[in-house]
């Protein structure tokens, strides 16, 4: 009996992991669609928005390398927001584009309203999430559409 309970639990866990993995794949596809492939003209960004770190150099970026860099970066961003549970992927995708420090705060920069609401237990974050659509102080419609799509496909109710 214990064996069957253990097997059932493992199968249930595997189903949850697969669901999260498939959502991760959707997030990767969404980022690829909006970021596009960066080449040397977009220095210091390469591949699908990977920012070169000191000491890194990728003179010739293939699609496969760009994809693996995107996945590694997105996993790091999601790990930074692990404490938010189901919202960690959504916050990781946003941080991939705007940076972790804009959300979590650092130095003189305070925490974002989005993070403060989630910490308070309020998951009604649509307005705060889609507010990250500005470039140089002006709202950009294409960025707003991106945020709307990200929220629609990645927010777990």
Predicted regions located by residue number:
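Long, amphipathic alpha-helical surface segments
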Residues: 16-38, 50-54, 61-83, 100-157
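Residues that flank catalytic or metal-binding motifs in active/ligand-binding sites
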Residues: 27, 42, 87
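Positively charged n-region of N-terminal signal peptides that target proteins for export
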Residues: 1-3
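Hydrophobic h-region of N-terminal signal peptides that target proteins for export
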Residues: 8-18
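Short, glycine/acidic-enriched capping/hinge loops at junctions between secondary-structure elements
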Residues: 42-43, 57-59
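Short N-proximal segments of mature Sec-exported proteins
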Residues: 88-102
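Early exported N-terminus immediately downstream of N-terminal targeting peptides
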Residues: 42-46, 50
